From Swiss-Prot:
Pfam families: Glyco_hydro_114. Transmembrane segments: none annotated. Residues 19-43 are annotated as: Disordered. Residues 29-43 have a biased composition (Pro residues). Disulfide bonds: none annotated. NCBIfam families: MJ1477/TM1410 family putative glycoside hydrolase. This is Uncharacterized protein DR_0705. It comes from the Bacteria. The lineage of its organism: Bacteria, Thermotogati, Deinococcota, Deinococci, Deinococcales.
Protein backbone atom coordinates (compact mmCIF):
# COMPACT_ATOMS: atom_id res chain seq x y z
CA UNK A 1 0.00 0.00 0.00
CA UNK A 2 1.20 3.49 -0.80
CA UNK A 3 2.32 5.79 2.03
CA UNK A 4 -0.52 7.72 3.61
CA UNK A 5 1.36 11.02 3.65
CA UNK A 6 2.40 12.70 0.40
CA UNK A 7 5.60 14.73 0.57
CA UNK A 8 4.95 18.13 2.12
CA UNK A 9 6.83 19.58 -0.83
CA UNK A 10 5.09 17.46 -3.48
CA UNK A 11 1.59 17.09 -2.05
CA UNK A 12 -1.02 16.10 -4.56
CA UNK A 13 -4.37 14.38 -4.44
CA UNK A 14 -4.56 10.99 -6.14
CA UNK A 15 -7.54 10.08 -8.27
CA UNK A 16 -8.81 7.18 -10.29
CA UNK A 17 -11.65 6.40 -12.68
CA UNK A 18 -15.04 5.56 -11.29
CA UNK A 19 -16.43 2.11 -11.79
CA UNK A 20 -19.63 0.43 -10.65
CA UNK A 21 -19.70 -1.08 -7.20
CA UNK A 22 -19.34 -4.85 -7.04
CA UNK A 23 -22.68 -6.55 -6.56
CA UNK A 24 -23.44 -8.42 -3.39
CA UNK A 25 -20.76 -6.63 -1.35
CA UNK A 26 -23.04 -4.64 0.94
CA UNK A 27 -25.14 -5.63 3.95
CA UNK A 28 -28.75 -6.66 3.44
CA UNK A 29 -29.98 -3.67 5.42
CA UNK A 30 -28.40 -0.25 5.62
CA UNK A 31 -28.57 1.55 8.98
CA UNK A 32 -29.52 5.22 9.13
CA UNK A 33 -26.65 7.68 8.67
CA UNK A 34 -24.70 8.68 11.76
CA UNK A 35 -24.29 12.42 12.22
CA UNK A 36 -21.07 13.59 13.83
CA UNK A 37 -21.81 15.97 16.73
CA UNK A 38 -20.57 19.45 15.87
CA UNK A 39 -19.21 20.32 19.30
CA UNK A 40 -15.80 19.29 20.62
CA UNK A 41 -15.79 16.41 23.11
CA UNK A 42 -15.48 17.56 26.70
CA UNK A 43 -13.71 14.48 27.99
CA UNK A 44 -11.40 11.98 26.33
CA UNK A 45 -13.32 8.70 25.98
CA UNK A 46 -11.87 5.24 26.34
CA UNK A 47 -10.22 4.19 23.10
CA UNK A 48 -12.81 1.45 22.71
CA UNK A 49 -15.58 4.07 22.97
CA UNK A 50 -14.34 6.32 20.14
CA UNK A 51 -17.05 6.70 17.49
CA UNK A 52 -15.72 9.52 15.31
CA UNK A 53 -12.19 10.16 14.12
CA UNK A 54 -10.31 12.23 11.56
CA UNK A 55 -6.95 12.69 9.86
CA UNK A 56 -5.11 15.86 8.81
CA UNK A 57 -1.48 15.54 7.75
CA UNK A 58 -0.75 18.94 6.23
CA UNK A 59 -2.43 22.25 5.34
CA UNK A 60 -2.47 23.56 8.90
CA UNK A 61 -1.65 27.13 7.87
CA UNK A 62 -1.76 30.03 10.29
CA UNK A 63 -4.52 28.43 12.37
CA UNK A 64 -2.11 25.60 13.20
CA UNK A 65 -3.91 22.87 15.20
CA UNK A 66 -6.98 24.97 15.95
CA UNK A 67 -9.15 22.94 13.56
CA UNK A 68 -8.24 19.85 15.56
CA UNK A 69 -8.86 21.58 18.89
CA UNK A 70 -12.36 22.68 17.85
CA UNK A 71 -13.30 19.53 15.94
CA UNK A 72 -15.97 17.08 17.11
CA UNK A 73 -13.69 14.08 16.64
CA UNK A 74 -12.73 11.96 19.63
CA UNK A 75 -9.50 10.85 17.93
CA UNK A 76 -7.43 12.77 15.39
CA UNK A 77 -4.23 11.77 13.59
CA UNK A 78 -1.86 14.63 12.70
CA UNK A 79 1.68 14.96 11.45
CA UNK A 80 4.09 15.70 14.32
CA UNK A 81 5.48 18.63 12.29
CA UNK A 82 3.81 21.84 11.16
CA UNK A 83 3.80 22.92 7.52
CA UNK A 84 7.29 24.39 7.88
CA UNK A 85 8.74 21.14 9.18
CA UNK A 86 8.97 22.33 12.79
CA UNK A 87 7.81 19.93 15.53
CA UNK A 88 4.62 21.03 17.24
CA UNK A 89 5.41 22.55 20.65
CA UNK A 90 4.18 20.52 23.61
CA UNK A 91 1.78 23.32 24.60
CA UNK A 92 0.01 23.16 21.24
CA UNK A 93 -0.18 19.39 21.43
CA UNK A 94 -1.74 19.58 24.90
CA UNK A 95 -4.32 22.12 23.74
CA UNK A 96 -5.30 20.11 20.67
CA UNK A 97 -5.51 16.91 22.73
CA UNK A 98 -8.08 18.27 25.17
CA UNK A 99 -11.06 15.93 25.15
CA UNK A 100 -9.63 13.59 22.50
CA UNK A 101 -6.86 11.22 21.55
CA UNK A 102 -4.22 13.09 19.57
CA UNK A 103 -2.17 10.60 17.60
CA UNK A 104 1.04 11.30 15.66
CA UNK A 105 1.59 9.95 12.16
CA UNK A 106 4.95 8.24 11.60
CA UNK A 107 6.11 6.19 8.64
CA UNK A 108 7.87 3.26 10.29
CA UNK A 109 8.19 1.11 7.18
CA UNK A 110 9.54 3.71 4.75
CA UNK A 111 11.95 6.65 4.75
CA UNK A 112 10.92 10.14 3.62
CA UNK A 113 13.47 12.49 2.10
CA UNK A 114 11.67 15.58 3.43
CA UNK A 115 12.11 14.57 7.09
CA UNK A 116 14.68 16.03 9.45
CA UNK A 117 16.61 12.78 9.74
CA UNK A 118 17.40 12.71 6.01
CA UNK A 119 21.06 13.41 5.31
CA UNK A 120 22.62 15.02 2.27
CA UNK A 121 24.12 12.47 -0.06
CA UNK A 122 21.81 9.62 0.85
CA UNK A 123 20.74 7.52 -2.12
CA UNK A 124 19.49 4.03 -2.83
CA UNK A 125 21.95 1.62 -1.24
CA UNK A 126 23.78 4.29 0.74
CA UNK A 127 23.05 3.76 3.59
CA UNK A 128 22.60 0.04 3.04
CA UNK A 129 19.11 -0.04 4.55
CA UNK A 130 17.78 2.52 2.02
CA UNK A 131 16.07 0.58 -0.74
CA UNK A 132 14.09 1.55 -3.83
CA UNK A 133 12.26 4.84 -4.24
CA UNK A 134 8.52 4.47 -4.66
CA UNK A 135 7.78 5.56 -8.26
CA UNK A 136 4.29 6.71 -7.27
CA UNK A 137 5.47 8.76 -4.30
CA UNK A 138 8.67 10.75 -5.00
CA UNK A 139 10.78 11.16 -1.89
CA UNK A 140 9.46 7.97 -0.26
CA UNK A 141 11.84 5.01 -0.06
CA UNK A 142 11.45 1.40 0.97
CA UNK A 143 13.70 0.48 3.85
CA UNK A 144 15.17 -2.66 5.35
CA UNK A 145 12.95 -2.20 8.39
CA UNK A 146 14.70 -5.09 10.14
CA UNK A 147 18.04 -3.23 10.00
CA UNK A 148 19.11 -1.86 13.43
CA UNK A 149 20.40 1.34 11.80
CA UNK A 150 16.98 2.19 10.35
CA UNK A 151 15.26 1.17 13.55
CA UNK A 152 17.44 3.55 15.56
CA UNK A 153 16.40 6.43 13.30
CA UNK A 154 12.72 5.54 13.50
CA UNK A 155 12.79 5.11 17.28
CA UNK A 156 14.40 8.53 17.63
CA UNK A 157 11.39 9.95 15.77
CA UNK A 158 9.14 8.08 18.18
CA UNK A 159 11.01 9.53 21.16
CA UNK A 160 10.36 13.03 19.87
CA UNK A 161 6.65 12.30 19.46
CA UNK A 162 6.45 11.02 23.03
CA UNK A 163 8.27 14.10 24.31
CA UNK A 164 5.81 16.34 22.44
CA UNK A 165 2.99 14.80 24.45
CA UNK A 166 1.09 12.82 21.83
CA UNK A 167 -1.21 10.08 23.07
CA UNK A 168 0.01 7.52 20.57
CA UNK A 169 1.40 6.79 17.14
CA UNK A 170 -0.32 5.93 13.86
CA UNK A 171 2.27 3.86 12.00
CA UNK A 172 2.29 3.82 8.21
CA UNK A 173 3.81 1.22 5.88
CA UNK A 174 3.40 -1.71 8.23
CA UNK A 175 2.32 -3.61 5.12
CA UNK A 176 5.77 -3.00 3.62
CA UNK A 177 6.66 -6.60 4.46
CA UNK A 178 4.55 -7.60 1.46
CA UNK A 179 7.20 -6.08 -0.83
CA UNK A 180 9.83 -8.60 0.26
CA UNK A 181 8.62 -11.88 -1.20
CA UNK A 182 12.22 -13.05 -1.54
CA UNK A 183 12.80 -12.70 2.20
CA UNK A 184 11.21 -15.65 4.03
CA UNK A 185 11.16 -13.94 7.41
CA UNK A 186 9.81 -10.58 6.24
CA UNK A 187 6.40 -10.96 7.87
CA UNK A 188 7.78 -12.18 11.20
CA UNK A 189 10.35 -9.37 11.13
CA UNK A 190 7.58 -6.80 10.72
CA UNK A 191 5.70 -8.26 13.67
CA UNK A 192 8.91 -8.11 15.71
CA UNK A 193 9.49 -4.50 14.60
CA UNK A 194 6.00 -3.40 15.63
CA UNK A 195 6.40 -5.09 19.00
CA UNK A 196 9.80 -3.43 19.47
CA UNK A 197 8.20 -0.04 18.78
CA UNK A 198 5.45 -0.78 21.30
CA UNK A 199 7.88 -1.87 24.01
CA UNK A 200 10.08 1.18 23.41
CA UNK A 201 7.12 3.57 23.69
CA UNK A 202 5.46 1.92 26.67
CA UNK A 203 8.71 1.94 28.62
CA UNK A 204 8.34 5.74 28.61
CA UNK A 205 4.54 5.98 28.72
CA UNK A 206 2.62 2.80 29.58
CA UNK A 207 -0.59 4.37 28.21
CA UNK A 208 0.92 5.22 24.82
CA UNK A 209 -1.32 3.93 22.03
CA UNK A 210 0.04 1.87 19.12
CA UNK A 211 -2.06 1.92 15.92
CA UNK A 212 -0.60 0.23 12.83
CA UNK A 213 -2.07 1.21 9.48
CA UNK A 214 -3.06 -1.58 7.07
CA UNK A 215 -1.70 -5.15 7.26
CA UNK A 216 -4.72 -6.06 9.39
CA UNK A 217 -3.95 -9.71 8.67
CA UNK A 218 -1.02 -9.58 11.11
CA UNK A 219 -3.53 -9.97 13.95
CA UNK A 220 -3.30 -13.70 13.16
CA UNK A 221 0.41 -13.79 14.08
CA UNK A 222 1.36 -14.93 17.60
CA UNK A 223 2.13 -12.06 19.94
CA UNK A 224 1.00 -9.27 17.63
CA UNK A 225 -2.30 -8.52 19.37
CA UNK A 226 -0.55 -7.80 22.67
CA UNK A 227 1.63 -5.16 20.99
CA UNK A 228 -1.11 -3.06 19.37
CA UNK A 229 -4.18 -1.18 20.58
CA UNK A 230 -6.23 -0.61 17.43
CA UNK A 231 -6.07 -1.03 13.67
CA UNK A 232 -6.20 1.69 11.01
CA UNK A 233 -7.02 0.74 7.43
CA UNK A 234 -7.28 2.46 4.07
CA UNK A 235 -9.60 1.67 1.20
CA UNK A 236 -11.90 -0.99 2.59
CA UNK A 237 -14.83 0.06 0.43
CA UNK A 238 -13.41 2.80 -1.81
CA UNK A 239 -10.08 3.10 -3.59
CA UNK A 240 -8.62 6.59 -3.95
CA UNK A 241 -10.63 8.23 -5.20
CA UNK A 242 -14.29 7.39 -5.75
CA UNK A 243 -13.55 3.88 -7.05
CA UNK A 244 -15.40 1.07 -5.25
CA UNK A 245 -13.26 -1.83 -4.10
CA UNK A 246 -13.88 -5.42 -5.14
CA UNK A 247 -16.17 -7.66 -3.13
CA UNK A 248 -13.32 -10.14 -2.62
CA UNK A 249 -11.13 -7.46 -1.07
CA UNK A 250 -13.93 -6.42 1.24
CA UNK A 251 -14.53 -9.99 2.40
CA UNK A 252 -10.84 -10.56 3.07
CA UNK A 253 -10.44 -7.34 5.06
CA UNK A 254 -13.64 -7.81 7.03
CA UNK A 255 -12.52 -11.29 8.04
CA UNK A 256 -9.35 -9.78 9.54
CA UNK A 257 -11.27 -6.93 11.14
CA UNK A 258 -13.50 -9.40 12.96
CA UNK A 259 -10.42 -10.87 14.64
CA UNK A 260 -9.45 -7.40 15.87
CA UNK A 261 -12.95 -6.86 17.18
CA UNK A 262 -12.96 -10.24 18.91
CA UNK A 263 -9.72 -9.18 20.61
CA UNK A 264 -11.48 -6.04 21.88
CA UNK A 265 -9.52 -3.68 19.64
CA UNK A 266 -11.26 -0.94 17.59
CA UNK A 267 -10.88 -0.85 13.83
CA UNK A 268 -10.61 2.59 12.21
CA UNK A 269 -11.13 2.88 8.47
CA UNK A 270 -10.45 5.67 6.01
CA UNK A 271 -12.02 5.96 2.57
CA UNK A 272 -10.98 8.46 -0.08
CA UNK A 273 -14.12 9.81 -1.73
CA UNK A 274 -15.88 13.10 -2.40
CA UNK A 275 -19.03 11.89 -4.15
CA UNK A 276 -21.84 12.22 -1.58
CA UNK A 277 -23.62 8.97 -2.42
CA UNK A 278 -20.39 6.98 -2.32
CA UNK A 279 -19.28 8.67 0.90
CA UNK A 280 -22.60 7.85 2.53
CA UNK A 281 -22.57 4.24 1.35
CA UNK A 282 -19.00 3.62 2.52
CA UNK A 283 -19.60 5.11 5.96
CA UNK A 284 -22.87 3.27 6.50
CA UNK A 285 -21.41 -0.07 5.47
CA UNK A 286 -18.43 0.46 7.75
CA UNK A 287 -20.62 1.25 10.74
CA UNK A 288 -22.84 -1.74 9.98
CA UNK A 289 -19.69 -3.88 10.29
CA UNK A 290 -18.78 -2.30 13.63
CA UNK A 291 -15.98 -0.15 12.18
CA UNK A 292 -15.19 3.51 12.88
CA UNK A 293 -15.05 5.25 9.49
CA UNK A 294 -13.60 8.51 8.25
CA UNK A 295 -14.22 9.67 4.68
CA UNK A 296 -11.95 12.36 3.26
CA UNK A 297 -9.89 13.67 0.39
CA UNK A 298 -6.74 11.74 -0.52
CA UNK A 299 -4.62 14.85 0.13
CA UNK A 300 -5.61 14.81 3.83
CA UNK A 301 -4.89 18.53 4.00
CA UNK A 302 -8.01 19.40 5.99
CA UNK A 303 -10.40 17.80 8.42
CA UNK A 304 -13.71 16.91 6.79
CA UNK A 305 -16.15 17.68 9.59
CA UNK A 306 -19.34 16.91 7.70
CA UNK A 307 -19.07 13.14 7.85
CA UNK A 308 -21.88 11.02 6.41
Amino acid sequence: MKPLLCSLLLLSACAGPSEPQASGAGPAQTPPPVTVPMTPPSKKPALSAVQHWGVQLTGYGQTRLNAVHTSPFELVVVDPFDDDGTPWPAAEVRAAAQGRWLIAYLSMGAAESYRSYWQKGWKVGAPAWLLNEDPDWPGNFDVAYWDPAWQAIALAQLDRVIAQGFDGVYMDLIDAYQRHDNRPGARAEMVAWVCKIAAHARAQNPQFVIIPQNAAELIRDPGYAACVDASGNEETYVYAANRPTEAARQRELLASYRLWQQAGKPVFTIEYANQPALMKSAAERARAAGLIPYVGERSLDKLILNQP
